[in-house]
Curated annotation (Swiss-Prot):
Gene3D superfamilies: Photosystem II protein D1-like (1.20.85.10). A ubiquinone binds at residue 194. It comes from the Bacteria. Keywords: Bacteriochlorophyll, Cell inner membrane, Cell membrane, Chlorophyll, Chromophore, Electron transport, Iron, Magnesium, Membrane, Metal-binding, Photosynthesis, Reaction center, Transmembrane, Transmembrane helix, Transport. It is found in: Cell inner membrane. This is Reaction center protein L chain. The gene is pufL. Fe cation binds at residues 168, 208. GO terms for molecular function: bacteriochlorophyll binding; electron transporter, transferring electrons within the cyclic electron transport pathway of photosynthesis activity; metal ion binding. Belongs to the reaction center PufL/M/PsbA/D family. It comes from Acidiphilium multivorum. The lineage of its organism: Bacteria, Pseudomonadati, Pseudomonadota, Alphaproteobacteria, Acetobacterales.
Length: 255
């Protein structure tokens, strides 16, 4: 039951700190081995595809492998620390469960997908510009990644999450900051506003549940969209939609 001032640490807080410090030190080491100290250009690359699923020398991808283990250890420790805090507070495990979806997305990118494709080199590098290049190159490898159906679902859910919670947040700000001479508004006014605005109000508790559902759905769909690309679909994503062109409705009344 270890605390630092008002902050609960616990066993998993200690393990999280260990993995964070070790991983950070290895990143600095990798940067020292590289050609630049420019924060934008520093990159810790995964092993070459020729190494497959084997261990690589430290300077040729081995650092990336150890840093990945440290990252998973840090994320997992932090989630378990959240579990301990939730139990101490007597609340549900919604926060660690939500964080676990983000961990799943990371593990999908760096562990599950490379495993299914047979090489750690299919993971993304650790670096600002290098990881953006990886995203761009991976997208072009499938011609137009926006045609990936799960990518469509993920983007839709991300934007819908933003819209739903922006509507809620802006309404709360409007309700608790009335013009001079007016009283502060409460939940019944908020419900009435949305019933008048869109015909339905999900309620003050419901909007937070909806926001959580949309956000976690976005994270899960984003992990799924990259998992499909490579292990299960190797062509360009536009060609996946060929079935759409052969629906009977397009042949109706034709020759």
């Amino acid at each position: 039951d270890f605390w630092v001032g008002p902050f609960y640490v616990g066993f998993f807080g200690v393990t999280a700190a260990f993995f964070i410090m070790l991983g950070t030190a290895l990143i600095i080491w990798g940067a020292a081995l590289g050609p630049t100290w420019n924060i934008w250009q520093i990159s810790i690359a995964p092993p070459d595809l020729s190494y497959g699923l084997g261990l690589a020398p430290l300077a040729k991808g081995g650092l990336w492998q150890i840093i990945t283990v440290c990252a998973i250890g840090a994320f997992g420790s932090w989630a378990l620390r959240e579990v301990e805090i939730s139990r101490k507070l007597g609340i549900g495990l919604h926060v660690p469960a939500a964080f676990s979806v983000a961990i799943f997305a990371y593990v999908t990118l760096e562990v599950i997908r490379p495993l299914l494709m047979g090489a750690w080199g299919n993971g993304f590098p650790y670096g600002i510009m290098s990881h953006l290049d990886w995203v761009s190159n991976t997208g072009y490898a499938y011609l137009n990644f926006e045609y990936n159906p799960m990518h469509m679902v993920a983007v839709t859910l991300f934007f819908t999450t933003t819209l739903a919670l922006a509507l809620h947040g802006s309404l709360v700000l409007a309700a608790i900051n009335p013009p001079a001479g007016e009283t502060v508004k409460f939940a019944e006014h908020e419900d009435t506003f949305f019933r008048d605005f869109i015909g339905y109000s999900i309620g003050t508790l419901g909007i937070h549940r909806l926001g959580l559902f949309l956000a976690l759905g976005a994270g899960f769909a984003s992990a799924t969209c990259i998992l499909l690309s490579g292990p299960f679909w190797t062509q360009g994503w536009p060609s996946w939609w060929g079935w759409w062109l052969h629906l009977p409705i397009w042949q109706f009344g034709g020759h």
